[in-house]
Amino acid sequence: MNWLSQYKNTPASLRLTCFITSIIFSVLMTSPARAEEDRLVGLIPAITAAKPFKLAVTVVHLNDDFYKGIIYGITDEAKRTGVNVVQVSVAGAYGNVREQFAQLEAFKSIGADVAVLAPAAYNGFDPIIKSLKDAGIKVASVGIPVDSKNIDFGVLQDDTYIGKLMADAVCKAAAKPKKVAMIPGPAGAEWVRLRYEGFKAEAQKCTSPVSVIDSAFGGGIDLQEGLAKASDLMLRNPDINFIYTPQITLGMGAVQAIRQQHRDAAVVSSAMVKRAVPMIEDGKMLAVVSEPGIIMGRLIVQYAIREMENKPLPNLAPAGADGLSYAHYNVPNKVLDKSNVATHPFETYEIAPADWKVPAMQ
């Protein structure tokens, strides 16, 4: 007797009970309580602060969902766990290190217990970080790496691996031959360099040859920069069929250039935004790596609580790993393409709620 026959021979009252039970179970599985359990997506157990403390944060800019996601993750997790976010500061752009030095210095006067830094440059921060440590402030690195041995812990991502993921998407694409125009990104940013090198190293391993058209590091990460550089590269190299950009705003500019020139080419990039969804669906954006800023922000708060209470910090790679001088956790990254972009849970990983407002900034 198969399962359908058994079901038909079951009394109607029992069948009704089973049906109602299945509905209740389904509701429970999608209830707010379950969402609460899943906000850290199983990466670390959630704890609350035994005693409130003050956390201040400075990031590079708030021009994209990556840094907005980090700030949302920090502020929302802090509310849930009894941590006070006393300052949110923004450097304004990559390279604005003097502005960020002043912001970090100001954290002393407002009594911050933990300073969180997404640096505007890789180098030059060690003296100011050491001065924070000397003042009794714990310092955490978020989102992108910084060259300092005085960081207590970091929540980052493996930028070399992100570059490799983008190259792998090109390798798997059907188009042959493959000719990739490189828009490397701003000079002096370590994450930019690592993604570039990761992409080129992985591209050399493709089963079908990949040729790369290089261009110089430099410029910003705005849409106009991506449009201008992609337009120039395609005009000088008519057989380009892929464009690499390390960040999504540059990538969307490159897509605009492809459309303007009516070219049969596709972009690979990183740091997903919802505006890129239709670009993926129509094939102009081949693949985008998800960078879960919200998860990074939540993890920073969870690790800060443990650091303040002298509790173990689980899952951290030791100092020396990935070329960094401090212990850190690399969040998992996922490639979004036509096969999965429609079902990706953006609100869990990278995009803050539409009604959320950025806190008062300095």
Which residue ranges define each predicted feature?
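Periplasmic-binding protein-like
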Residues: 57-58, 108-119, 138-142, 181-183, ...
